[in-house]
Curated annotation (Swiss-Prot):
The keyword Ribonucleoprotein applies. The gene is rpmH. GO terms for cellular component: ribonucleoprotein complex; ribosome. Pfam families: Ribosomal_L34. GO terms for biological process: translation. NCBIfam families: rpmH_bact. GO terms for molecular function: structural constituent of ribosome. The keyword Ribosomal protein applies. PANTHER family: LARGE RIBOSOMAL SUBUNIT PROTEIN BL34M (PTHR14503:SF4), MITOCHONDRIAL RIBOSOMAL PROTEIN 34 FAMILY MEMBER (PTHR14503). InterPro entries: Ribosomal_bL34, Ribosomal_bL34_CS. It comes from the Bacteria. This is Large ribosomal subunit protein bL34.
Length: 44
């Protein structure tokens, strides 16, 4: 049986990376929430 998680750094960054978050209004809201919460790491 094939596992569902097949890691790829490029895919990870393109979907969850900082620049991907900054590209949309909602993504910027995600970063703002994580900053407000005090997350050490904002994005992948």
């Amino acid at each position: 049986m094939k596992r569902t998680f097949q890691p790829s750094v490029l895919k990870r960054n393109r979907t969850h990376g900082f620049r991907a978050r900054m590209a949309t209004k909602n993504g910027r809201q995600v970063l703002a929430r994580r900053r407000a919460k005090g997350r050490k790491s904002l994005s992948a």
